[in-house]
Curated annotation (Swiss-Prot):
Residues 143-218 form the Ubiquitin-like domain. Pfam families: PH_UBFD1_C (PF25343), ubiquitin (PF00240). InterPro entries: UBFD1, Ubiquitin-like_dom, Ubiquitin-like_domsf, Ubiquitin_CS. SUPFAM superfamilies: Ubiquitin-like (SSF54236). This is Ubiquitin domain-containing protein UBFD1. Residues 233-244, 251-260 have a biased composition (Basic and acidic residues). The gene is Ubfd1.
């Protein structure tokens, strides 16, 4: 007799194992064709479903069904279950092999990477990647000062760095007016030294900078001799006796030094003092003083009777000569007109101020 399985009631077994079916092979042989003939009768009988499946399995085994054959409809269900089942976790050996394979893939990927070609120095793309922070600096970050440049009765408002030198200021004026730096006379409380900064000479914002000078064409027009005869005349004048020996000058020099004459420093050159130059004689022997009004570009010649205010641009020439026996003092003349008769003579000028007077009145470009 076949024993009923121990499964829970109502739960159908999916398959019958090969071992179960082969156990009944001897019985199936005895049954033979009789069991097959009665198969239709078994299907229509009221036996339990489990018994029917057991008998079916026995008959199929007896008929020579290969071991491991499963019931119809079971493969699809098993495949669905296998598909839904989670992946089995890897053991240590498989995990180590997977890590090694990943490392090889990473090395291959790195080997395929090629460095980007270097851009040539002149490549515009390489130049575009460079930051153009300043220039600079050019004036970025420098303290600027507002100045009013006055030249030829024209005002120019400019901004320059406070730490720029007098030489750099002349270059700035040259870019504005066209005056070459060598022909500029830049004044702010006296001549502006080229080697000092605007900060050092205490230039403040809004200051007025006076510029005196002529263009190259103007200088050539004034100083170019009209003919060779004029050059010969100048050469003859140089061969004449010293001015201090001429009668018109001798009568003034014979009076001696004024009692209030300014002290002199032989062999030295100094800037003009901030006070007027005094203690000098004019051609009539009267006391005279010279005041240089740089802000107004004027020279004031003061006597006891009156003060003449002369624009510096109207002075054609300045000549000087040391006084014999007193070489630390000069006699000096300012040419106010077209001829020598218009010379205004001044005597006993301290030698250290002679060059400063010529530079202030004529500018450094003068050739005398």
């Amino acid at each position: 007799m076949l024993k009923r399985g121990r499964g829970r009631p109502g739960k159908r077994r999916r398959r019958v194992s090969i071992e179960t079916s082969t156990c009944f092979r001897p019985a199936c042989v005895k049954l033979g064709a009789g069991a097959g003939a009665n198969l239709r009768q078994l299907a229509s009988s009221r036996r339990p479903l489990r018994s029917w499946w057991v008998l079916y399995t026995i008959i199929m085994a007896a008929a020579g069904a290969p071991d491991g054959m499963e019931e119809p409809g079971m493969d699809t269900e098993a495949e669905a279950v296998a598909t839904e089942a989670p992946a089995r976790p890897l053991n240590c050996v498989e995990a180590e092999a997977a890590v090694g394979a990943a490392a090889e893939d990473s090395c291959d990927a790195r080997g395929n990477l090629q460095p980007a070609p270097a851009q040539p120095p002149g490549d515009p793309a390489a130049q575009a990647s460079v930051s153009n922070g300043e220039d600079a600096g050019g004036g970025v970050g420098k303290e600027l000062v507002d100045l009013k440049i006055i030249w030829n009765k024209t005002k120019h408002d400019v901004k320059v760095p406070l730490d720029s030198t007098g030489s750099e200021l002349k270059q700035k004026i040259h870019s504005i007016t066209g005056l070459p730096p060598a022909m500029q006379k830049v004044m702010y409380k006296g001549l502006v030294p080229e080697d000092k900064t605007l900060r050092e000479i205490k230039v403040t914002s809004g200051a007025k900078i006076m510029v005196v000078g002529s263009t190259i064409n103007d200088v050539l027009a004034v100083n170019t001799p009209k003919d060779a005869a004029q050059q010969d005349a100048k050469a003859e004048e140089n061969k004449k006796e010293p001015l201090c020996r001429q009668k018109q000058h001798r009568k003034v020099l014979d009076k001696g030094k004024p009692e209030d004459v300014m002290p002199s420093v032989k062999g030295a050159q100094e800037r003009l003092p901030t006070v007027p130059l005094s203690g000098m004689y004019n051609k009539s022997g009267g006391k005279v003083r010279l005041t240089f009004k740089l802000e107004q570009d004027q020279l004031w010649i003061g006597t006891k009777e009156r003060t003449e205010k002369l624009p510096m641009g109207s002075i054609k020439n300045v000549v000087s000569e040391p006084i014999e026996g007193h070489e630390d003092y000069h006699m000096m003349a300012f040419q106010l007109g077209p001829t020598e008769a218009s010379y205004y003579w001044v005597y006993w000028v301290p030698t250290q101020y002679v060059d400063a007077i010529k530079d202030t009145v004529l500018g450094k470009w003068q050739y005398f």
